[in-house]
């Protein structure tokens, strides 16, 4: 084939391809035009669609109302439930600087709540975190037993004092923040702000640093406003779906209530608190769902606060010897008897033990029948508080009593630039238990401290 024939052949092929392409384009235009005409003439006729659309619906977990009408379970001792080892892990991992951890349970899970300092362990921002109240403190939570890291934790509220509890439907959180002379408690229900409570004495409004207590859809908390070393003002709040529906101020002259540990028992609420003014035994307040209340002090000569005198003769009023200052704590009332949790040291926040005094709620002697070791006196402890596992969680027909212990490390007792803590928890059982020591165990100082 000579060059002219090649040119003619290639040109013919290109012309044929062009004609075919033109015909296809014309056909496509006609098809679109016909489709448009059909849609115009039949506007209500459904158009078939072969697209596959996936719909994602979040399945809400079944909710119940936590009745709180059961009595405390009979127990003979305490089984270890959790230990987060957060200070040990935080020497190399990303762990929040925290204090005031506490545990609360819904009908599905238990969570550790804690007040962060807006800083991580072994980091420059941990410097000076011995301070209680700052605008950087937040309430966060994580699954019980896990170290409070940024990757496993959930933000709850901006707060330097807090409480939280679950009514069977949603979490209620109470976070107090703001200046000492005008702080405000922000109430959230299911993560949404629902109410606020303004400081009524303008003197460091503060709350429990442990779980509130829920009965039949209502949740109850105790707040303090006023001096930490003399008469202050104390209020009980009844909260439903995050809104305050009733409150009452306690008529409690010569009493001092701070950082109450509250739990439901047979449809009523019992709170055991800290007297920072003049009592080395613990004050209590119990009330029904209408906020009709009774007040007193644990009578036992086995004293529950720290600092405190050696055990001796108790009082159903404040025991003033070594009564100033104190530490958050708890007890569980069983009729006339009481389980008392306390530091082993009478003068510092070290060691921890549980003591059963079979008549200690009402009698003043110092005899007791059981003692279980939790932390050795040579190791640091700190705050402690109660929490309850409802029958809806455990499947029992009673309220399981539990407690947590904060294990404070760092300042002011150790040579670090920071203050933080880990936590352990125990639950009451009516079977075999063991006493031992479960300390924090971190080796200090950290790199940032050197």
From Swiss-Prot:
Keyword DNA damage: no
Name assigned to this protein: Neuraminidase
GO MF term set: exo-alpha-sialidase activity; metal ion binding
UniProt subunit comment: Homotetramer.
Positions annotated as glycosylated: 50, 69, 127, 216
Cofactors, names only: Ca(2+)
Function: Catalyzes the removal of terminal sialic acid residues from viral and cellular glycoconjugates. Cleaves off the terminal sialic acids on the glycosylated HA during virus budding to facilitate virus release. Additionally helps virus spread through the circulation by further removing sialic acids from the cell surface. These cleavages prevent self-aggregation and ensure the efficient spread of the progeny virus from cell to cell. Otherwise, infection would be limited to one round of replication.
Pfam family, one: Neur
Organism placement in taxonomy: Viruses, Riboviria, Orthornavirae, Negarnaviricota, Polyploviricotina
Residue ranges, Virion surface side: 28-450
EC number from the UniProt entry: 3.2.1.18
Region (Hypervariable stalk region): 36-71
InterPro entries: Glyco_hydro_34, Sialidase_Influenza_A/B, Sialidase_sf
Residues bound to substrate: 99, 133, 258-259, 274, 349
Modes of activity regulation: Inhibited by the neuraminidase inhibitors zanamivir (Relenza) and oseltamivir (Tamiflu). These drugs interfere with the release of progeny virus from infected cells and are effective against all influenza strains. Resistance to neuraminidase inhibitors is quite rare.
Reaction(s) catalysed (UniProt annotation): Hydrolysis of alpha-(2->3)-, alpha-(2->6)-, alpha-(2->8)- glycosidic linkages of terminal sialic acid residues in oligosaccharides, glycoproteins, glycolipids, colominic acid and synthetic substrates
Subcellular location: Virion membrane; Host apical cell membrane
Chain sites annotated for binding Ca(2+): 275, 279, 305
Chief subcellular location: virion
Disulphide-bonded residues: 73-398, 105-110, 165-212, 214-219, 260-273, 262-271, 299-316, 402-427
Membrane topology: Single-pass type II membrane protein
Transmembrane segments: 7-27
Family of the protein in this entry: Belongs to the glycosyl hydrolase 34 family.
Keyword Hydrolase (UniProt): yes
Additional detail: The influenza A genome consist of 8 RNA segments. Genetic variation of hemagglutinin and/or neuraminidase genes results in the emergence of new influenza strains. The mechanism of variation can be the result of point mutations or the result of genetic reassortment between segments of two different strains.
Domain of life: Viruses
Taxonomic source organism: Influenza A virus (strain A/Chicken/Hong Kong/220/1997 H5N1 genotype Gs/Gd)
CC annotations in GO: host cell plasma membrane; membrane; virion membrane
């Amino acid at each position: 084939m000579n060059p002219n024939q090649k040119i003619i052949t290639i040109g013919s092929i290109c012309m044929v391809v062009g004609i075919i392409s033109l015909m296809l384009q014309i056909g496509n235009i006609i098809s679109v035009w016909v489709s448009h005409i059909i849609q115009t003439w039949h506007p209500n006729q459904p158009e078939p669609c072969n697209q596959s659309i996936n719909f994602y619906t979040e399945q809400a977990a079944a909710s119940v109302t936590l009745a709180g009408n059961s009595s405390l379970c009979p127990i003979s001792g305490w089984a270890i439930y959790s230990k987060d080892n957060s200070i040990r892990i935080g020497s190399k991992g990303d762990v929040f600087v925290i204090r005031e951890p506490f545990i609360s349970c819904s009908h599905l899970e238990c969570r550790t709540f804690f007040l962060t300092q807006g800083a991580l362990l072994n980091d420059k921002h941990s410097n000076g975190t011995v301070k209680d109240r700052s605008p950087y403190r937040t309430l966060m939570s994580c699954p019980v037993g896990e170290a409070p890291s940024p990757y496993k934790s959930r933000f709850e509220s901006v707060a330097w004092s807090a409480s939280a509890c679950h009514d069977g439907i949603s979490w209620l959180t109470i976070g107090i923040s703001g200046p000492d002379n005008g702080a405000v408690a922000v109430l959230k229900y299911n993560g949404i702000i629902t109410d606020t409570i303004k400081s009524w004495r303008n003197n460091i409004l503060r709350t429990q640093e442990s779980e509130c207590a829920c009965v039949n859809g209502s949740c109850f908390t105790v707040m303090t406003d006023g001096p930490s070393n003399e008469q202050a003002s104390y209020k009980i709040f009844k909260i439903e779906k995050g809104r305050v529906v009733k409150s009452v101020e306690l008529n409690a002259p010569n009493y001092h209530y701070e950082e109450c540990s509250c739990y439901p028992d047979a449809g009523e609420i019992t709170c055991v608190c800290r007297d920072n003014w003049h009592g080395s035994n613990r004050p209590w307040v119990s009330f029904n769902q209408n906020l009709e209340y009774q007040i007193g002090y644990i009578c036992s000569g086995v004293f529950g606060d720290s600092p405190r005198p050696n055990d001796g003769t108790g009082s159903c009023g404040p025991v003033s010897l070594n009564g100033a200052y104190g530490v958050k704590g708890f007890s569980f009332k069983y009729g006339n008897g009481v389980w008392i949790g306390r530091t082993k040291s009478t003068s510092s926040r070290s060691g921890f033990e549980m003591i059963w005094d079979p008549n200690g709620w009402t009698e003043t002697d110092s005899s007791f029948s059981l003692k279980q070791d939790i932390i050795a006196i040579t190791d640091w402890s700190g705050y402690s508080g109660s929490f309850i596992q409802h029958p809806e969680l455990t499947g029992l027909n009673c309220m399981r009593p539990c407690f947590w212990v904060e294990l404070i490390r760092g300042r002011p007792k150790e040579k670090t630039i920071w203050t933080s803590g880990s936590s352990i928890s125990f639950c009451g059982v009516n079977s075999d238990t063991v006493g031992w020591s479960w300390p924090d165990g971190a080796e200090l100082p950290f790199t940032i401290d050197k």
